[in-house]
Structure formats: structure tokens, C-alpha cells
């Protein structure tokens, strides 16, 4: 289930994250980045690696909560019956871009856990982009659409979606404070 990829990244960057949950989330990121493609191809190793990655991710995020990837995905499922994992997968790279200024060194560790080489030699901007690009590539490799319009989201609903997302329980855990206008802009970027 691709959603676990997002639970671990969101949990790792949430305001409530701490040393133990960071370790759990980084291990889950590593496992899922390594095994997701194989799981989609239905290999035994891929399925087993994903099962372990999902379990480890659950131990992490259940202790710290989530952020606006989930806040924004919940209304998509309510309005359009979009599968929750797909909604999260489409939104994650856009939310990562928004949250990057409030994540310190965490994107370096995300990039490293996802197998990006040379992160120690990268500037902050470079490793943040590398982490986001690694997520985008993994999504592409397993057939996740890049844009919201590809999953049936209608532009006329973006304002209402933004207002609903802002009220979601997960919003408070996001590492970067946001407004309905911020969320609307993220939806617009993900829509086009």
C-alpha cells in the first residue's frame, strides 16, 4: 500500500516528531523505497519488505500524527471517492515543497534513506530537491498520477477542498503553519 510511504515521511517531519519516531520513520522510508517496486510487481521479497515497512511506519506515525498531505487527501476521498493512498501519493511532493523551509536537515535523511547518492556533498536546497525528486520518481515507477486532474479532481472545487482541509485534525501537526490560501495554492500546483 503506497500510502505507507507518505505516513512515514509525514510522521518524520511532523511537529511532534522526536528521536525514537525519527528512527522508526527513517527505517520505514528505507524499507519502502527499497521494496515498493517489487511489491507492485508482486515479488515475495517486495511484499515482505513492504509489510515490514508498513509495520515500522505505523509504530512511528501512531505516536506523532500526520500533516497536511493527509488533511488535503481526506476531502479528495470525500468529494470524489479517490482512494486514500492515491490522493496522498499525488499530493506528497507538492506538500514537501511547501514544508521544506521548516524541515531542517530532515530532507537530507529522507534522500539518503531513499537511496540518493552523494547527499553529504549537497547543499540544503540540493538535498531537499533530491528528496522530493526521489519521491516523484518512486511514484512514477509505480504508476501514481502526477496531477490531481488525472484522478478526477475538478478545479471548481479547489476552494471548498482547501477550506475542508484546513479544518482537518492532521493540519495542526504539519511542520509549517498554513492558511486556507496556502492549501489552495498547493492544490492548484498539484492540479495544473
Give each language-model segment a name.
Residues 1-64:
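Carboxylate- and glycine-rich phosphate/diphosphate-binding segment that chelates Mg2+/Mn2+
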Residues 3, 28, 50-58, 72, ...:
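Short alpha-helical scaffolding segments that buttress acidic/His motifs in well-ordered protein cores
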Residues 13, 17-24, 42, 64, ...:
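Catalytic cores of large soluble enzymes that bind and process phosphate-bearing ligands
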Residues 31, 49, 130, 134, ...:
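Charged catalytic carboxylate motif
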Residues 55-88, 168-173:
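Glycine-rich phosphate/pyrophosphate-binding beta-alpha loops
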Residues 79-157:
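Gly/Pro-rich interdomain helix-loop hinge
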Residues 154-192:
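Short, amphipathic C-terminal "tail helix"
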Amino acid at each position: 500500500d503506497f500510502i505507507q510511504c507518505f505516513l512515514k515521511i509525514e510522521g518524520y517531519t511532523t511537529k511532534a516528531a522526536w528521536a525514537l519516531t525519527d528512527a522508526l520513520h527513517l527505517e520505514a522510508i528505507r524499507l519502502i523505497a527499497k521494496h515498493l517496486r517489487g511489491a507492485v510487481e508482486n515479488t515475495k521479497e517486495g511484499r515482505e519488505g513492504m509489510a515490514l515497512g508498513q509495520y515500522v511506519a505505523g509504530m512511528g506515525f501512531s505516536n506523532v500524527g500526520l500533516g497536511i498531505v493527509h488533511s488535503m487527501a481526506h476531502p479528495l476521498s470525500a468529494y470524489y471517492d479517490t482512494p486514500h493512498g492515491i490522493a496522498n501519493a499525488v499530493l506528497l511532493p507538492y506538500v514537501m515543497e511547501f514544508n521544506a523551509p521548516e524541515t531542517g536537515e530532515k530532507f537530507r535523511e529522507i534522500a539518503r534513506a531513499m537511496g540518493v547518492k552523494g547527499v553529504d556533498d549537497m547543499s540544503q536546497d540540493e538535498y531537499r530537491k533530491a528528496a522530493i525528486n526521489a519521491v516523484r520518481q518512486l511514484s512514477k515507477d509505480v504508476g501514481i498520477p502526477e496531477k490531481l486532474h488525472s484522478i478526477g479532481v475538478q478545479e471548481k472545487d479547489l476552494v471548498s477542498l482547501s477550506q475542508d482541509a484546513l479544518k482537518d485534525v492532521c493540519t495542526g501537526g504539519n511542520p509549517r503553519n498554513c492558511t486556507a490560501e496556502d492549501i489552495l495554492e498547493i492544490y492548484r500546483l498539484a492540479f495544473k
